[in-house]
Amino acid sequence: MFQTFTETASPDQGPPRLAALRKELAKAGLDGFLVPRADAHQGEYVAPRDDRLAWLTGFTGSAGWCVALRERAAVFVDSRYRVQVKAQVAADFEKIDWPETTLADWIGEALPKGKLGFDPWLLSVEQHRTLSGKLPDVTLTPVENLVDAIWLDQPDPPQGAVFAQPLELAGEAHEDKIARLAGKLTAKAAVITLPDSIAWLLNIRGSDIPRNPVPHGFAVLHADGRVTLYMDAAKLTGLGDHLGDKVTLRAPGDFLGDLAAIEGKVQIDPATCPVAVAEALTDPEEAADPCLLPKACKNAAELEGTRAAHLRDALAMVRFLAWLDLQPPGNLTEIAVVEKLEAERSATNALRDISFETISGAGPNGAIVHYRVTENTNRKVNDGELLLVDSGGQYVDGTTDITRTIAIGTPGAEETEAFTRVLKGMIAVSRLRFPKGLAGRDIDPLARVALWEAGLDYGHGTGHGVGAYLSVHEGPQRIARTGTVPLEAGMILSNEPGFYREGAYGIRIENLIAVEVAPKLYGQTVAEMLQFETLTWVPIDRRLIDPNLLTADERNWLNDYHRRVHDLLTPHLDAATGQWLSDACSVI
């Protein structure tokens, strides 16, 4: 079992740890200290050793900040976590809606002048620039991490074994990737900090970050077609000669010294480069991580692997959903749901890990967007409630992510209308043909129109990028108000509109989709059009759909989708599960 259900943090831990941190502030002569949920690699996910925000405050979400001052402290979270933070964080910390209120806004009011400490490995160049520009009277002071000074049982750095990703799944040899990217550099070299960028570039995988098959390390891509990899050699013993003569291995402790010795411009990505790295360079030049776009645009082998992973995952999901429908309401718990679903994925004999902690939210817990069930929060799945299940798997050929909201018993009229409006938004994105050059922010409103018509909305983005046996959240592509990167063929994204009634229920429907070139139409004047290929093939709960709210085109799309689900999966199912699927996919 990959997922566990123990409490990893508690509101009670925050006040004494905050008091200890304030003693460190006094010793260091500081007025405050920044605690981001970040590590030295500046990715979204962190190893247990680096989860300082959770250790200090009790908040376990995947994004957030704490600003600890001598008299005040605040935790900043986005819309996904505003219900969760209330339950996890003590009253000693103010709860701030971010980014509506930025760190600079709050600090400017709470600390107009003073010295604000930060760990230069945990703050990116871009973040530092933003804060220093908006807080001219606050001195940002780099210091050794003050949380580490009081975290006496801090876990050791992860040492997961590194292994090669087979060429038939990667689709391109790492030597060719290196040559292709190096040839485009305008600087002498580029620093790469993101673990998934390094893993993609070198066709390696690891296990240093839970649920993410990536190793910790740093890399420098040189314009002459070489890579210097900074990683503990003990983790690489299983690689053999995979890296070849284009990759030089160096100890992590050599990283900053080697950077300082490079003569000429060195490219850094200000969004992911720590201040400590930038300050080691003589002549830094800012540009995007050179791996981001190539990694996002999957090649034919990666797409084929992803399709295979989704078919395998869909069979596990359907077996789970068929089982779920047989369970009497009130006899089932959220934890039992997670255990059964993971068991079905494990039964494929291909599961390497789950791609994130399964969200199993019954009734009001479904309104906690990134809810993680524990032994303390576990509740029964009762008659008349909605059950929101958001889950995914890491397979060697692909990464999956799917959400289905299921009616337990007979749903109410309000829930049915809200679900159907969410479905209309998901269908609108799925059916879309659009001119090449549009970004995610141009598409995001289509997922919301049906909700807006009823005065409803959701706070999170509509879609995030997804890796190929890499991180389930991958940039730079996203379907959101902030999604400014044009979508390109080969990009994989989620399509997951939702609606959440705090204290009552949550609704989300999620498929993964891949951007592809659309066939030319007769009379087409746009040079190139794109469309989405659906990757996820699992039925959508018909009991929650009001057909009267669907247009003819929407009904046709849904019936075609369910026909495809039925035809793809039925040959691989036993008779009873096949009959359940046939009923679940019947025409609306």
Residue ranges of predicted features:
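Active-site neighborhoods and metal-handling regions in enzymes and metal-associated proteins
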Residues: 1-588
